[in-house]
A protein has these predicted regions:
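Conserved beta-strand positions in repeat-built beta-propeller and related beta-rich domains
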Residues: 1, 46, 54-57, 94, ...
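Asp-box/WD-like beta-propeller blade repeats and closely related beta-sheet repeat scaffolds
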Residues: 1-42
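Surface-exposed loop and turn segments in beta-propeller and other repeat-based domains
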Residues: 20-35, 79, 126-138
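Loop/turn-rich, solvent-exposed surfaces of beta-rich toroidal or solenoidal domains
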Residues: 141-174
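Short coil/turn segments that connect the beta-strands within blades of beta-propeller domains
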Residues: 48-50, 96-98, 151-153
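Short loop/turn segments immediately following beta-strands, especially the blade-tip
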Residues: 6-16, 66-73, 113-123, 168-175
Length: 175
């Protein structure tokens, strides 16, 4: 579904307390038989804990929200507009927080973005796109997961349909 729910956690017990905000994505996707409505597949905070990034594979966006930590309220501040029919599925940030990796289910690729902030405005600049499979015909093939190795040196992705796992070395300077 296309909804993000923010929950307050009790500071002494860690237990879930009240709902502090709910945000609904709106819009239509381009693949009528598959991804025609908002469908949030992954949310991640930036490493500096300022912004929540929400991948929506139904409308091909990653919406960027500023989180008010005191009130638990989200405010949209940016949108990463992914390629049409790409279906952004999972997000991961590099250990140092400078790079965002987005694996797209239908496009079968990893998009690499450089992240920085200027004057309280987040910027995500696309710097590289890497295919997750060497197949040229993607019918029945879908990138399905993204992870970074414990030592931060490799991106690992899996692709359903051709049943493969791919490993990419991360250039620590350029992402």
């Amino acid at each position: 579904d296309g909804k993000i729910t923010v929950l307050h956690l009790d500071s002494s017990t860690g237990a879930v307390d009240a709902i502090t905000d709910e945000v609904f994505h709106r819009g239509l996707g381009s693949i009528a038989e598959r991804s025609y409505r908002p469908h949030i597949s992954c949310v991640k905070m930036t490493r500096d804990n300022k912004y929540l990034c929400a991948a929506d594979l139904g409308i091909d966006y990653v919406n960027i929200y500023r989180l008010d930590h005191d009130r638990g309220v989200l405010r949209q501040v940016d949108i990463i507009r992914c390629d049409i029919d790409s279906a952004p599925r999972h997000l991961k940030f590099s250990e140092d927080g400078r790079f965002l990796y987005i694996v797209s289910e239908m496009k079968n690729c990893i998009d690499v973005y450089e992240y920085h902030e200027e004057d309280n405005v987040p910027f995500f600049d696309l710097i590289q796109t890497i295919p997750t499979s060497d197949k040229f015909e993607y019918k029945g093939v879908a990138a399905s997961a993204l992870n970074i190795s414990f030592d931060g040196r490799y991106i690992i992705t899996s692709t359903a349909g051709d049943n493969c796992v791919s490993l990419f070395e991360i250039n620590q300077k350029t992402g």
